[in-house]
Amino acid sequence: MNLSEELLEAFKGFSGAHGQTDVSQERTAGKQKAKSFIVRNPLTLQLMEGHISGKKGIGAIPINEENKCRFGALDIDEYPLDHNQLIDKLEELKVPCIVCRSKSGGAHIFFFFKEWMSAGDFRDKAAEISSALGHGRCEIFP
């Protein structure tokens, strides 16, 4: 399996649509302007390959048609953020996840599951984790 196929498998969600972000060259307060929207077509291998190559920003919709998910995320937008301290705390709590620095300097914490789980159950658990990390007000996806 190549990287695009692995990512498409890891980010399985709603099969009828995906997110897309178009970034303009226009800047406001130092940040590039972007417009995100839903495209009512499935997320495909070709789209994932374009995303990896930097051609088009896309995103999977985590919740499937049965209100279940196989991945979720925390979006921490608190600054300054000590990423090493965050990772140490997650390891201390024995939370299996992947931490990525966001473009703005915050963090995206991704969780992946072998089986589909209730989106509500994930949100409840993610809220517990975010509170334990001291970031109880962060965004939870889904």
Could you say what each language-model-derived stretch is?
Residues 1-71, 80-85:
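DNA replication initiation on ssDNA origins
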Residues 7, 134-142:
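Catalytic "initiation/cleavage/transfer" segments centered on a nucleophilic residue
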Residues 17-21, 95-99, 136-138:
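Short secondary-structure junctions
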Residues 30, 40-44, 54, 101, ...:
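A signal for specific C-terminal beta-sheet/loop modules enriched in small/flexible residues
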Residues 61-64, 97-104, 139-142:
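Short beta-strand
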Residues 71-77, 81-102:
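Active-site-adjacent loop/helix surface patches within enzyme catalytic domains
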Residues 73-74, 96-122:
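Histidine-centered divalent-metal-coordination microenvironment in nucleic-acid enzymes
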Residues 82-92, 112-137:
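Helical (often loop-to-helix) elements that flank the catalytic cores of nucleotide-handling enzymes
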